[in-house]
Amino acid sequence: MNIDQSKIPQATAKRLPLYYRFLKNLHASGKQRVSSAELSDAVKVDSATIRRDFSYFGALGKKGYGYNVDYLLTFFRKTLDQDEMTNVMLIGVGNLGTAFLHYNFIKNNNTKISMAFDVNESKIGSEIGGVPVYDLDKLEEHVQEVGDIPVAILTVPAVAAQPITDRLIALGIKGILNFTPARLNVPEHIRIHHIDLAVELQSLVYFLKHYSITQED
């Protein structure tokens, strides 16, 4: 089945890796089929939403039977390009950046941090989690040597985020995962995801104080 991925709602697309991770766990445990209710309980997404998400991809299950785990796993592996490796660069090897290098998305088959950059001389030239750390001043040199690194993770001070982003744009970056408080200006063809941990924490505290669980959607 040929599916126009651009017509899949972004909210649905963001949930696909969550479904895929749970299906991998089911497959590893030997489970052969799963219902939308079981999926719902595991991933904390209501079953109606799961059925709607899956409906964008055609008939993935059978009424009264549920979903075949092997079939779903194979389908979502292909949909999420799990067999195609995407190299990622990390910029900013502070506490958060160092944690990313040690983790390096080992549970993902299709993403890998292949190089990191920093300005700290004590880190330049070292390896952290098997990832080489280079001088940020030589960003262009190292990226051009390697070639295709379409994604960058930013874990730098906010004041440095936009100037570094401008350099990444010039290098042809396609996507940025931004962990800085800065709201970055990028061309329309570049996708950027902002993850501000301080804002997320403040939002959580606000909801705890002012909303009960039953009030939320």
UniProtKB/Swiss-Prot annotation:
Enumerate the InterPro entries for this protein.
CoA-bd, NAD(P)-bd_dom_sf, Rex_DNA-bd_C_dom, Tscrpt_rep_Rex, WH-like_DNA-bd_sf, WH_DNA-bd_sf
Residue numbers of the DNA-binding region are 18-57
Q: Superkingdom, according to UniProt? A: Bacteria
Kindly give the PANTHER family that the UniProt entry links to this protein. Answer: REDOX-SENSING TRANSCRIPTIONAL REPRESSOR REX, REDOX-SENSING TRANSCRIPTIONAL REPRESSOR REX 1
Name of the molecule in the record: Redox-sensing transcriptional repressor Rex
User: How does this protein assemble?
Assistant: Homodimer.
Pfam families reported in the protein's UniProt record? CoA_binding, Put_DNA-bind_N
Q: Which residues bind NAD(+)?
A: 92-97
GO cellular component assignments: cytoplasm
Q: Please give the chief subcellular localization of this protein.
A: cytoplasm
Does the record's keyword annotation contain Glycoprotein? no
Molecular function terms from GO: DNA binding; DNA-binding transcription factor activity
Q: Where is it localised?
A: Cytoplasm
Segment forming the signal sequence = none
Which keywords has UniProt assigned to this entry?
Cytoplasm, DNA-binding, NAD, Repressor, Transcription, Transcription regulation
Q: What does this protein do?
A: Modulates transcription in response to changes in cellular NADH/NAD(+) redox state.
The Gene Ontology biological process annotation of the record reads:
negative regulation of DNA-templated transcription; response to redox state
| Family membership noted in the UniProt record | Belongs to the transcriptional regulatory Rex family.
